A protein has these predicted regions:
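Acidic, low-complexity terminal tails and accessory targeting/binding regions
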Residues: 2, 76, 83-94, 137-139, ...
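Generic beta-sheet signal
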Residues: 4, 139-147
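Loop-to-helix element that buttresses phosphate recognition and phosphoryl-transfer chemistry
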Residues: 4-62, 113-126
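Phosphate-coordination/substrate-recognition cap region in phosphate-metabolizing enzymes
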Residues: 38-100
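Glycine-rich phosphate-binding loop signature in dinucleotide/nucleotide-binding domains
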Residues: 46-49, 132-139
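Active-site signature of alpha/beta-hydrolase-fold catalytic machinery across serine-
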Residues: 67, 152-156
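Short glycine/proline- and acidic residue-enriched helix-loop micro-motifs
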Residues: 100-120
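GST superfamily/GST-like fold recognition
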Residues: 147-151, 171
Length: 200
């Protein structure tokens, strides 16, 4: 059975500046590099290696994938890219619209501003992953993506998380892949929070 390790990139310059970072990009910070090393240490400690490594086409994800895996042969996939925040790209996060009461995502709030609907993001990421999975018989895959993209995927999969849980930098979702390429979340691992583990 294939195991998919889907993780968020390390901290970036825009993260520290609290700027919206979707389709725009910024480099990993020194802390972001350290976070990637924490994730790498987790995989090494658990004896986990990867048959193939994938990342979004954005630099912050590809650089994280290379650092975590220790490999240069990272396959870039556009479908793993971060959500498009439209006119809010690179702007202060404080300018973003607020979630509707009771909501746990932007839903379609950014569409009028040229952004994406989080549900469409989730479908895009899900379809991209399934396309890879249906064409492989490999046992262990690493994919590096982005916070909102991963959240959208989990919404598409109808996964619920405990209150207050979010994808911090280099958060790792461990999925078991069934024969029909469907995904079952087994664990969420947070290397930057003393390797805290949530089981599902």
């Amino acid at each position: 059975m294939t195991t998919l390790y889907l993780m968020r990139h390390g901290e970036t310059l825009f993260n520290t500046q609290k700027r919206v970072q979707g389709v725009c990009d910024s480099p990993l910070t020194a802390l972001g590099l350290e976070q990637a090393q924490l994730a790498k240490a987790y995989f090494e400690r658990e004896g986990i290696s990867f048959d193939a490594v994938y990342a979004s086409t954005q630099e912050r994800a590809t650089d994280t994938a290379k650092l975590v895996s220790g490999r240069e042969d990272v396959t870039q996939l556009k479908g793993l890219k971060e959500m498009d925040f439209g006119i809010f790209e690179a702007q202060p996060e404080s300018l973003l619209p607020k979630f509707r009461e009771g909501a746990n995502s932007f839903e379609e709030l950014l569409v009028p501003y040229g952004g994406e609907d989080i549900r469409e993001v989730g479908k895009r990421v899900h379809e991209t992953i399934q396309e890879v999975l249906k064409g492989t018989d490999q046992d262990s895959l690493l994919m590096v993506s982005h916070g909102a993209a991963m959240w959208g995927l989990c919404l598409d999969l109808r996964i619920t998380f405990p209150p207050g849980v979010y994808f911090s930098n280099c958060a790792i979702c461990v999925f078991k892949v069934l024969d029909d390429a469907s995904l079952t979340l087994e664990q969420l691992i947070l290397p930057t929070q003393e390797y805290r583990v949530y089981d599902f």
